[in-house]
C-alpha cells in the first residue's frame, strides 16, 4: 500500500471517529481508533499514526467524562476531582509532541520495537468508571522509528497531515481545559451569593472568540460544530440572564431565540443524518449526555424567568387561560408558585419591583423605537411593579413604604436574606427578598406576621434561589436537584 492509499484509508477511520464524537457516541469512537491502532501495530504499517490513534482513544475517554460533568463531583470530602484536567493536560503535551515529531524531515527506516504499542499512562478511576472502556487505554510513546512508507517520496504528505491535525487537536484540548475551568467556576459561584453573570458572560465570550478560527480542519467539523453550538448556546443564555436582570425585553428575547436555535442544532446532532427524519429515532432525555440535558434545563429556566418578568407584556398578546396553559407546560411555573404563596399565606399581594433609576434605555412597555424619546421615571414610578399577584392589584399606597425599606435595608437585601418590616400605623407586614440586583420581591400582609414565619420565609427563599439562578447552576453537579 503506497502512502496515498494509506492516507485515504486512515482518513476514513478518522472521519468515522470524529463523526462518532460529534454524535456523543464515545464508545464507538474509542473502539474505532483502537481497532485500527491494533491493526497497524500488528503489520508495522506506520507507528506515528498508531501513536496518534492511541491519543485519540484517550481523548474519547476525556470527552465522555467532560460531557458527563462527573468531574464537578468531589473525589472525596473537600477534595476536587482533577482527573479530567490532568487528562486534557496529558493530551495537550502528547499532541504537541506528535505534531513536532511529524514535522521532522529526517525519517529513519526501522520497525517499531515491541514496546511501541505498550501503555505509558493509565486513566484515572473516575474516567474508567464511566463506561465499559478499557481501563488500560493510554497515550503511547513515539520512538524515533517510522514505517517503510517513510522511504516513499509521498511520506512527507502523510507527515504534514499528521502534524497539521495534531496541531489543531492541541488547540482543541486547550479550549476544552478552559471550558472545564469555566463550568467549575459556574458551579462554585452557584454555592455563594448573587452570581455575577456579566463577568461570566464576558469570560465565556473570550473563550469563544479565541477559538473561533482554531481546529478548523474539515475532518474536525463534527467536533468543531459541537464545541461551538455548546458554548454559543450557553453564552446566549447568560446574556439573556444579564438583560433580564436589567428588564430589557427585546434584547433578552433575541438572545433566547438564538439560544433556542443553537440548542435545536445541537440536539439534532445526537442523531445520525440518515435517522433525523424518523421521529422514533429521537433519543430519550435519560440517554442524553448530562451536559446537553443541563443546558436544555437552563434554557427552560430562562424562558420561565422571562415569562415572569415580562408577564404584563406577554399577557396583552394572549388570554388569561392561554397564559395559564403556557405556564403549566414550563419546567418551573413561577407565576403559579407566587400565586400559591399568596393564597396559602393569606397575603394581600405579592409583587416584583424593578429599580429603574439609572437604567439606560428603560421602557416600561417592552420594545421602544430608538428614535422615540422616553422620559426617565421619577418618584415612585422609578420603582415600577413588573409582576403582581393578584394581577388586578394596582394600589400604589404601599409603594412609598416598600421603596423606603429597599433603600434603608439595602445591605440586608444584598446579603440575600429576607427583610421583614411591620408598619404599625398602617398595620401591614412586609417581607422582601432580592431576586436580581435591581429586582425585589415583596409579600404584603394586612396583619402583623411573625418575621420568622416558617412557610413565608422558606417559600420566598426557595423562589429567590430559583429565580436568581443558584438552583439551576447548582444542578451542574450530577445528582443535584
Positions of the model-derived regions?
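Intrinsically disordered, Ser/Thr-rich regulatory regions of eukaryotic membrane-trafficking proteins
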Residues: 1-481
Amino acid at each position: 500500500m503506497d502512502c496515498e492509499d494509506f492516507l485515504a484509508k486512515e482518513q476514513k477511520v478518522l472521519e468515522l471517529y470524529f463523526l462518532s464524537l460529534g454524535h456523543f457516541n464515545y464508545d464507538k469512537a474509542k473502539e474505532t481508533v483502537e481497532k485500527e491502532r491494533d491493526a497497524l501495530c500488528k503489520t508495522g504499517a506506520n507507528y506515528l499514526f498508531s501513536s496518534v490513534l492511541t491519543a485519540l482513544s484517550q481523548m474519547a475517554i476525556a470527552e465522555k467524562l467532560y460531557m458527563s460533568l462527573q468531574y464537578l463531583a468531589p473525589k472525596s470530602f473537600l477534595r476536587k476531582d482533577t482527573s479530567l484536567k490532568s487528562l486534557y493536560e496529558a493530551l495537550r503535551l502528547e499532541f504537541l509532541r506528535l505534531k513536532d515529531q511529524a514535522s521532522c524531515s529526517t525519517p529513519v527506516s526501522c520497525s517499531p520495537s515491541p514496546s511501541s504499542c505498550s501503555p505509558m499512562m493509565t486513566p484515572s478511576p473516575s474516567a474508567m468508571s464511566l463506561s465499559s472502556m478499557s481501563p488500560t487505554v493510554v497515550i503511547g510513546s513515539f520512538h524515533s522509528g517510522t514505517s517503510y512508507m517513510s522511504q516513499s517520496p509521498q511520506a512527507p504528505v502523510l507527515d504534514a497531515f499528521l502534524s497539521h491535525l495534531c496541531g489543531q487537536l492541541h488547540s482543541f484540548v486547550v479550549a476544552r481545559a478552559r471550558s472545564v475551568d469555566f463550568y467549575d467556576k459556574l458551579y462554585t459561584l452557584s454555592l455563594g451569593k448573587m452570581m455575577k453573570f456579566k463577568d461570566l458572560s464576558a469570560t465565556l465570550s473570550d473563550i469563544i472568540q479565541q477559538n473561533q478560527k482554531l481546529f478548523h480542519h474539515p475532518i474536525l467539523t463534527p467536533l468543531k460544530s459541537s464545541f461551538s453550538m455548546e458554548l454559543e448556546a450557553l453564552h446566549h443564555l447568560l446574556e439573556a440572564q444579564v438583560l433580564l436582570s436589567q428588564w430589557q425585553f427585546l434584547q433578552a428575547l433575541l438572545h433566547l431565540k438564538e439560544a433556542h436555535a443553537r440548542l435545536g442544532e445541537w440536539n439534532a446532532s445526537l442523531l445520525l443524518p440518515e435517522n433525523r427524519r424518523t421521529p422514533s429515532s429521537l433519543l430519550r432525555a435519560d440517554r442524553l449526555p448530562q451536559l446537553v440535558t443541563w443546558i436544555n434545563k437552563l434554557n427552560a429556566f430562562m424562558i420561565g424567568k422571562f415569562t415572569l418578568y415580562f408577564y404584563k407584556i406577554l399577557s396583552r398578546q394572549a388570554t388569561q387561560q392561554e397564559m395559564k396553559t403556557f405556564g403549566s407546560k414550563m419546567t418551573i411555573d413561577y407565576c403559579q408558585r407566587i400565586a400559591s404563596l399568596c393564597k396559602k399565606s393569606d397575603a394581600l399581594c405579592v409583587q416584583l419591583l424593578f429599580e429603574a433609576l439609572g437604567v439606560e434605555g428603560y421602557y416600561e412597555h417592552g420594545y421602544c423605537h430608538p428614535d422615540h424619546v422616553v422620559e426617565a421615571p421619577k418618584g415612585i414610578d422609578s420603582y415600577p411593579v413588573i409582576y403582581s399577584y393578584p394581577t388586578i392589584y394596582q394600589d400604589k399606597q404601599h409603594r412609598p413604604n416598600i421603596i423606603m425599606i429597599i433603600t434603608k435595608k439595602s445591605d440586608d437585601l444584598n446579603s440575600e436574606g429576607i427583610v421583614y418590616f411591620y408598619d404599625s400605623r398602617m398595620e401591614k407586614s412586609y417581607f422582601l427578598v432580592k431576586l436580581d440586583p435591581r429586582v425585589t420581591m415583596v409579600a404584603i400582609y394586612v396583619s402583623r406576621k411573625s418575621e420568622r414565619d416558617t412557610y413565608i420565609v422558606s417559600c420566598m427563599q426557595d423562589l429567590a434561589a430559583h429565580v436568581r439562578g443558584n438552583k439551576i447552576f447548582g444542578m451542574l453537579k450530577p445528582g443535584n436537584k
